[in-house]
Regions:
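N-terminal cap/lid segment of alpha/beta-hydrolase-fold proteins
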Residues: 1-26, 76
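Catalytic nucleophile-loop/oxyanion-hole region of alpha/beta-hydrolase
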Residues: 7, 38-41, 64-102
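The serine-hydrolase catalytic nucleophile loop
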Residues: 34-47, 61, 238
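Conserved alpha/beta-hydrolase
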Residues: 48-68
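Primarily recognizes the serine-hydrolase "nucleophile elbow" in alpha/beta-hydrolase
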Residues: 85-163, 197-200, 208, 219
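Alpha/beta-hydrolase
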Residues: 153-215, 222
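Short beta-strand/loop motif that positions the catalytic acidic residue
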Residues: 220, 226-228, 232
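Conserved alpha/beta-hydrolase "acid-adjacent" motif
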Residues: 233-239
Length: 249
């Protein structure tokens, strides 16, 4: 296995894993989840895929890990554009078959792959794992109508302050993704991986609320596999099923 790291356009840092031998190979681009960096979780998947004969590409979104950009700034459309940038780079590499580039995404990245396939074009296939379809439904499904109204009103007021003054509140990742599973994951990894120990805008919650990958899923034409987990408490299986139904429509 040949492993190499590159800094490409837009300041995106990526790592390729390639099987030995000189022939062109199909490629899988692995797209991480919420505030994820390429050193965590993805290498295990990438190594298995590479052992099966694929070139694999892991990367850091702008603002995270080793990539350039404002630290902690998470905007879904910008991350989708990052994936498209990686797709275009992959298709230019002499060791990659440009007609066989696929996307594999987990959690938030599992939603991004639909947008990247639509915006980038030429994607051979998609695997979306443990993603959500509709951010507003996913975040507010447990709230009463009054609680939801108050929650959204608070975010809108904070957004108005930001636009008027340029000031915004930055918080730890676990203040935004605050379920027990996520807290445990970030607490376990931030010591070993200092790039995980960052602050993000509190209004990232609003970015997630407004994000609806299902709208892109309805436009996807390439073969797609949607993977859900029965006991997923972050992105319940109903969210993945909604993505599936949208793709099949």
């Amino acid at each position: 296995m040949i492993i190499s790291t590159h800094k490409i356009s837009e300041g995106i840092t990526l790592t390729t894993r390639s099987p030995s031998g000189g022939k062109k190979r199909p490629a899988i681009i692995l797209c991480h989840g919420f505030c994820g960096i390429r050193e965590i979780l993805l290498p295990q998947f990438a190594e298995v895929f590479t052992q099966a004969g694929f070139v694999t590409i892991t990367f850091d979104y702008r603002g995270f890990g080793d990539s350039d950009g404002e630290r902690g700034r998470l905007i879904p459309e910008m991350q989708i554009d990052d994936i498209v940038t990686v797709i275009n780079w992959a298709k230019e590499q002499p060791f990659i078959d440009k007609e066989r580039v696929g996307l594999w995404g987990t959690s938030l990245g599992g939603g991004h792959v639909f947008g990247a396939a639509v915006k980038g074009g030429g994607v051979k296939c998609i695997v979306s794992q443990l993603a959500f379809a509709d951010g507003e439904k996913n975040i507010t499904h447990h709230m009463s109508s009054e609680e939801k109204k108050e929650f959204i009103s608070t975010l809108e007021k904070l957004d108005a302050v930001k636009k008027a003054s340029g000031r915004e509140k930055f918080v730890s990742i676990t203040r935004v993704l605050n379920d027990n599973e996520s807290k445990k994951f970030f607490e376990e990894n931030r010591t070993q991986y200092p790039d995980m120990d960052i602050k993000i805008p509190f209004l990232t919650v609003k970015e997630m609320l407004d994000y609806k990958p299902v709208q892109y899923a309805a436009q996807v034409t390439c073969p797609s596999l949607i993977v859900v987990a029965e006991k997923d408490t972050v992105n319940p299986k109903e969210q993945g099923i909604e993505l599936y139904n949208s793709v099949m429509h």
